[in-house]
Amino acid sequence: MSSRNIVYIREFDKFNNNGCIICRNTGCENLIKSPFRKYCSKECSKQFEKWYYHNFYWDRVRSDIFKRDNYTCQICRKKYPYTYRRKFARSRGLECDHIIPRSLFKKLGYRFDSLENKVKMTTEFLHNHDNLRTLCKDCHKKVTKEYLRCNEMHTRSM
């Protein structure tokens, strides 16, 4: 399996003490500027993009999980024939599911308040191979729907 982990780009959104969005690029504390939505300049945007794609590869992680699970849905056990595996994986016939979703980590009090905490939480827990599994599209929808239903019931009972 790959030693690289995935971190979604949105994990790097940063805010100053006043709650204003500041540039996501590491070490930059400037306020974002139009026309950019997450950066202060084109240079910062390009630097961050290069760093992000060099260090974090979601496609690679997904591929590792699909291979580990032998291109088989871990719930219904539907197995994709070898000749179709790459095609189905690419067309999203298979999906990589987070067993413990990000929203639950936040509810449990895990910290995403600094860049270091975001990277640590994401790489060590959220996108750890033990927290990922291969599901077919239908099973992934069912799992997500059930999680949302249980979450809604829990929220109502509080």
Task: Name each region found by the language model.
Residues 24-28, 59-106, 136-138:
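Short cysteine-rich loop/turn motifs with clustered Cys
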Residues 1-7, 12-49:
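BZIP DNA-binding basic region
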Residues 9-16, 43-78, 123-126, 130:
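Short, charged surface segments at domain edges that flank catalytic/cofactor-binding sites
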Residues 44-45, 78-82, 125-154:
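Short Cys/His-centered divalent metal-binding micro-motifs
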Residues 67, 108-111, 123, 153-157:
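Terminal non-domain segments
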Residues 16-24, 36-37, 68-70, 92, ...:
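Short metal-coordination and nucleic-acid-contact micro-motifs, chiefly zinc-binding Cys/His arrays
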